[in-house]
């Protein structure tokens, strides 16, 4: 029997690219959807992947991308109007008679969350569950390891590790592990995974200070964990030219971490190993890859750049996130609340964590949600 053809949105991104690679290794035909052609998409084409250019806000382009497709990986846009793109995808999926969608969601997904992206993610969870004839699977990771390693150059070059989450702890999961999990869900399909949700995590809970110690052991020199107030994030983001919308959301996730959202009910699952047969990689393993990247190498040029940028950061005015949110007219609920403060969220997510004790047997190997 021929394997079903699978569409991967965000196919050149942090999780999309690992999904494409894993599916190809499993022998599945893949259509990689990108929003622009570049060296990464060209490399996919050289490897025999069908690449299509489409706008996630355009229902017609999405319908064209979905024609002849049985299953799809949906990666949401990190943009203020993400909900519109999700609605366009839902319309196209129904018209194209898609069999199964695997959706990247969030552990924090909550109707009243102060981060607009998380409010909208909750709506997408509900919307995709109601697409007629389309099976729906959610995987809802917590904190990505990438979020804790994007500033590893500060550690490598200056011997400091910025900590924005206080003493809060999370089990950071790598992009590669998320890609492997999504690929299994897509490959095994709706007969095994329709209507289910899975939370991939790293293998252990870590605080910012513990991450700093791991990074120090990798680099071979002292790294000082530097606790920073959340307003400093606005200065760093502006100095580095980062998207204010993304960082506006990230500040709330740092507060989530402080409050124990990511360590709730133990905070660690075995989903990665249960689904893929391989244990989740450690934070140390992921950090070693980042430490070897060009931006973190201890060259004279990188050292000078890091020194200048670090010393200039306090002089930047920084993003005023609340003002920026108002200017963008981002939707807000009447009474915003962090996920951990909501009884409905706690009940639903406690149940999800408890499900690991109630395995689903597929007939081929054990599955634990």
Roles of regions detected by a PLM:
Residues 9, 75, 104, 277:
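Residues lining the SAM
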Residues 105-106, 261:
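Short secondary-structure boundary segments
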């Amino acid at each position: 029997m021929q394997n079903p053809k699978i569409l991967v949105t965000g196919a050149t991104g942090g999780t999309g690219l690992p999904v494409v690679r894993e599916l190809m290794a499993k022998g599945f035909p893949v259509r990689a959807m990108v929003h622009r052609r570049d060296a990464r998409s060209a490399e996919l084409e050289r490897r025999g992947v069908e690449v299509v250019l489409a706008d996630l806000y355009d229902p017609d382009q999405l319908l064209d991308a979905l024609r002849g497709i049985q299953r799809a990986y949906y990666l949401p846009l990190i943009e203020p109007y993400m909900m519109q793109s999700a609605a366009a995808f839902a319309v196209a999926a129904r018209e194209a008679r898609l069999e199964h969608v695997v959706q990247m969601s969030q552990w924090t997904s909550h109707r009243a969350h102060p981060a607009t992206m998380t409010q909208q993610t909750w709506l997408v969870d509900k919307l995709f569950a109601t697409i007629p004839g389309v099976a729906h699977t959610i995987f809802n990771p917590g904190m990505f390891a990438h979020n804790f390693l994007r500033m590893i150059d500060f550690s490598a070059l200056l011997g400091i590790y910025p900590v924005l989450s206080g003493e809060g702890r999370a089990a950071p999961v790598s992009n590669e592990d998320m890609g492997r999990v999504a690929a299994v869900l897509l490959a095994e399909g709706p007969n095994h995974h329709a209507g289910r949700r899975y939370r991939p995590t790293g293998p252990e809970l870590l605080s910012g200070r513990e991450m700093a110690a791991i990074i120090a052991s990798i680099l071979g020199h002292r790294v000082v964990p530097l606790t920073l107030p959340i307003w400093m994030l606005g200065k760093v983001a502006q100095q580095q030219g980062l998207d204010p919308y993304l960082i506006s959301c990230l500040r709330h996730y740092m507060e989530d971490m402080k409050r124990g959202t990511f360590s709730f009910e133990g905070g660690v699952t075995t989903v990665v190993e249960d689904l893929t047969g391989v244990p989740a990689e450690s934070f140390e393993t992921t950090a070693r890859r980042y430490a070897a990247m060009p931006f973190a190498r201890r060259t004279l040029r990188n050292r000078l750049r890091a020194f200048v940028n670090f010393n200039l950061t306090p002089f930047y005015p920084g993003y005023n996130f609340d003002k920026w949110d108002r200017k963008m007219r981002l939707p807000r609920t009447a009474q915003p609340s962090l996920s951990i403060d909501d009884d409905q969220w706690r009940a639903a997510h406690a149940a999800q964590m408890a499900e690991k004790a109630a395995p689903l047997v597929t007939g081929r190997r054990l599955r634990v949600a």
